[in-house]
Amino acid sequence: MKQLWFAMSLVTGSLLFSANASATPASGALLQQMNLASQSLNYELSFISINKQGVESLRYRHARLDNRPLAQLLQMDGPRREVVQRGNEISYFEPGLEPFTLNGDYIVDSLPSLIYTDFKRLSPYYDFISVGRTRIADRLCEVIRVVARDGTRYSYIVWMDTESKLPMRVDLLDRDGETLEQFRVIAFNVNQDISSSMQTLAKANLPPLLSVPVGEKAKFSWTPTWLPQGFSEVSSSRRPLPTMDNMPIESRLYSDGLFSFSVNVNRATPSSTDQMLRTGRRTVSTSVRDNAEITIVGELPPQTAKRIAENIKFGAAQ
């Protein structure tokens, strides 16, 4: 596995230093076309998802039926794991677990969230850099880097089919250019008949909608005084921690439209210590000060998570 990741990093690195790379509005427009194609076309993708934990082989089918999205993600190897989208409901089927349904706009499991991003929203804070063209899955592809201007986030490289505008490969890179995750299409098909083959899903009985508990709305006595450019608060809540005698934890969720993270604050305990853990794209950074335990969880480099925690200000409720 180490050799595989080293080889991928070399290939990605050669793209990063292309002499012809340039940031252009046209690259952002192409990415916006990818967003539209991914949600409007009838198509099927067979792909592999690679990260530090291993390699998965999957199939994704998408169609528009009665002006509603219908999609299926299926794990091709091992126990059958399936995710089905019908309209704004996402149903999960996994061995050993009771099937359940959640509300959602699209399937996120094993698919790069970049595909569904509104690139117009990102344009003030990100550069979209054209790197050239190459072939993936026997298709000619545009290659585009997506890089935050302030250097505080991970970056992406996208290989997009020049005809269908569907993504053929997406690499997530850390700030040193190392590949953290890769989505790579092996075979694909764009065909109106795919909607016909998915008619059974359109009529299938799906599991009941799972009720997600809503956290208590409250004003907090803390706020972050520094965030990476473009991030804004999406939601906030206060919930008890069952594993810590129902101690309340206060949380704020932030997103820039591509990456997200949460800031979580609870009362420090005698066992509270500073910790830093990164697994793939996800960082968990815990720091203790002012009798509080501050934990940053999300899709951020460890240095950025640490800086956010250091800039939490305690004071009057807000």
Swiss-Prot record:
Disruption phenotype: About 2-fold increased sigma-E activity, 2-fold decrease in stability of RseA. Binding to RseA is inhibited by LPS fragments; phosphorylated N-acetylglucosamine (GlcNAc) with N-linked acyl chains are minimally necessary to disrupt binding to RseA. Once RseB is no longer bound to RseA the latter is susceptible to DegS degradation. Thus if periplasmic LPS levels increase the sigma-E regulon is induced. It comes from the Bacteria. InterPro entries: MucB/RseB_C, MucB/RseB_C_sf, MucB/RseB_N, MucB_RseB. GO terms for molecular function: antisigma factor binding; identical protein binding; lipid binding. Residues 222-318 are annotated as: Interaction with RseA. Disulfide bonds: none annotated. Keywords: Lipid-binding, Periplasm, Signal, Transcription, Transcription regulation. GO terms for biological process: negative regulation of DNA-templated transcription; protein stabilization; regulation of polysaccharide biosynthetic process. NCBIfam families: PRK09455.1. Belongs to the RseB family. The N-terminal domain (residues 24-203) is responsible for oligomerization, while the C-terminal domain (residues 222-318) interacts with RseA. This is Sigma-E factor regulatory protein RseB. The gene is rseB.
